[in-house]
């Protein structure tokens, strides 16, 4: 991916640092239990992703749960998140805009859009003296990080994902991300699961890779 576009003069959007791994197959109950050490909210939703030309991979567009149009701009990668022996993934910098979208009747998916069903468990953390602690969402702009464990259904196939998304002041995004990952990975994942860079990608990159595999 390549960074794209300058800041909009109208709005800065929401800046974030993110790491995500997406793996094939059903989510194992033991992994859900490992994640369940922390309080989490669970929701099911269906997002629809616009399938763009690979050259525009740094500009993903989706309709979130039929209620909001979201546009993200990739701002580059500041490096690798590494928890020795447990996880290694690409840190990605993003800027996101969200626009309300009225719900439509019917469940048809226009050409060029790919529906993705998600059952999401989301645990939220805030920073306290440089350490991550479980917390409810604070006021907008405060440093924090969401950890997300998601069961994915797409085109009749099962996948699962673990991701972290840090938001708040730009200077604290990296601290929030790494502190939350350190807390989450303080315990080994069940079954010796190790998350590697080969599975570390955004939803847009994953969808493009799946499409390439189908047409190979």
Task: Show the residue positions of the predicted features.
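Charged surface patches that recognize polyanionic ligands
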Residues: 7-14, 22-144
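Mixed-charge, glycine-accented linear interaction segment located at domain edges/termini
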Residues: 156-209, 213
């Amino acid at each position: 991916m390549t960074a794209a576009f300058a800041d909009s003069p109208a709005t800065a959007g929401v800046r974030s640092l993110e790491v995500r791994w997406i793996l094939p197959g059903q989510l194992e109950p033991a992994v859900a239990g490992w994640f369940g050490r922390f309080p989490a909210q669970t929701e099911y939703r269906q997002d629809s992703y616009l399938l763009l030309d690979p050259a525009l991979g740094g500009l993903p567009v989706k309709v979130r749960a039929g209620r909001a149009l979201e546009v993200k701009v990739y701002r580059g990668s500041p490096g690798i998140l590494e928890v020795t022996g447990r996880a290694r993934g690409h840190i990605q910098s993003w800027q996101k805009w969200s626009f309300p979208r009225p719900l439509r009747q019917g469940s048809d998916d226009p050409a060029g859009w790919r529906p993705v069903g998600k059952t999401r468990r989301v645990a939220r953390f805030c920073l306290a003296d440089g350490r991550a602690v479980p917390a409810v969402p604070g006021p907008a702009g405060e440093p924090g990080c969401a950890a997300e464990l998601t069961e994915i259904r797409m085109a009749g196939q099962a996948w699962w994902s673990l991701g972290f998304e840090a938001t708040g002041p730009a200077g604290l995004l990296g601290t929030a991300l790494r502190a939350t990952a350190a807390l989450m990975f303080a315990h080994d994942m069940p079954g010796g699961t190790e998350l590697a860079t080969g599975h570390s990608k955004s939803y847009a990159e994953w969808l493009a890779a799946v499409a390439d595999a189908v047409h190979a």
